[in-house]
Design a protein with these regions (language model features):
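Fe(II)/2-oxoglutarate oxygenase catalytic core
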Residues: 1-157
Length: 157
């Protein structure tokens, strides 16, 4: 497949008050972001149920940021129409059915995340976990970046 559009942009799609509400969801909950590396073996049931991922750690040569994962239905309902519309208007036309939990990322001055591919395909992938009933057996096809702060505060993608 040859894509003519690598990205799709909405400008000022969400009101500032809503952006501030989303930012507020992460207050006091942020943790230093880690990076995942592929695992070349299947996890045991005990490893999977523990929630502890082997080969996960902080590597500041690749990423300096803080994250919190959200599972807010109203936020999903807010962004899902944008995802579906972009999928069609950009000409991707992927078969998309659901979303992962929302990841709220905070970049302080000097923070970054080097070029990377979103999603995983190894045994740690959320898509390979049967408890994730809405996404099990699928793969991530699109990623959405929602910049919540004003341009003068940062927020370059």
């Amino acid at each position: 497949m040859v894509l003519t559009n690598q990205w799709y942009l909405y400008s000022a799609a969400i009101e500032k008050l809503v952006c501030d509400k989303i930012i507020g969801l992460g207050k006091e909950k942020f943790k230093k972001a880690s990076i995942d590396v592929p695992v070349s073996r299947d996890l045991s049931a005990e490893e999977r149920s523990s929630g502890i991922k082997p080969n996960v750690g902080v590597d500041e040569s690749i990423r300096i940021s803080d994250v919190v994962f959200l599972n807010e239905d109203w936020l999903f309902e807010l962004v899902w129409p944008f995802i579906k519309e972009a999928n069609v208007h950009a000409g991707w036309n992927y078969d998309i059915r659901s979303c992962e939990s929302q990841q709220l990322t905070r970049y302080k001055k000097g923070g970054y995340y080097k070029w990377h591919t979103d999603g995983r395909s190894d045994s740690l992938s959320a898509y390979n976990d049967p408890s994730n009933v809405h996404i099990n057996g699928y793969v991530r096809k699109l990623s959405l970046s929602l910049l919540l702060n004003d341009n003068f505060e940062g927020g370059e993608l």
